[in-house]
């Protein structure tokens, strides 16, 4: 069984704590641009929140597209990026291959960004004050 995040966008308070803590884990400092989870919303009609993150899908389009085999699925079903194998620079096939738009390319950053479930204990779930995220 694939372990992945589950979201209830209706509970999201738009506090952005999940993105801040995720980026801290991913790159060492808090900047939502480097987060594996993205929050978007539509205003003004009705507040509609969308949370985008890697679903650890069974299809593994990103894995298949990587010319360096830098994306691998572990024994828990979590797709992880082996940074030492990732040699893509400007063109990142995994970003384009993801049907869910859940792998992100950040300018001037050497690796794609995606949710890797924080080694099985997602920090975003731990810090979410509204219970919008769970495993």
What are these regions (language model features)?
Residues 2-7:
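N-terminal beta-strand motif that seeds the catalytic metal site of vicinal oxygen chelate
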Residues 17-38, 61-78, 92-109, 122-135:
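Iron-sulfur cluster-binding cysteine motifs and their immediate structural context
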Residues 37-42, 46:
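Intrinsically disordered, low-complexity segments
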Residues 46-60:
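Short, structured active-site "lid" loops
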């Amino acid at each position: 069984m694939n372990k992945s995040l589950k979201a209830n966008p209706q509970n999201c308070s738009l506090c952005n704590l999940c993105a801040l803590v995720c980026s801290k884990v991913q790159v060492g400092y808090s900047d939502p641009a480097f987060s594996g989870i993205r929050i978007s919303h539509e205003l003004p009609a009705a507040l509609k929140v969308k949370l985008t993150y890697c679903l650890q899908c069974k299809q593994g389009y990103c894995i298949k597209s990587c010319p360096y085999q830098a994306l691998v699925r572990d024994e828990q079903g979590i797709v992880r990026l082996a940074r030492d194998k990732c040699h893509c620079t400007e063109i990142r096939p995994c970003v384009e291959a993801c049907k869910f738009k859940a792998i992100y390319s950040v300018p001037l950053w050497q690796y794609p960004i995606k949710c890797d479930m924080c080694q099985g204990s997602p920090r975003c779930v731990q810090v979410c004050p509204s219970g919008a995220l769970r495993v």
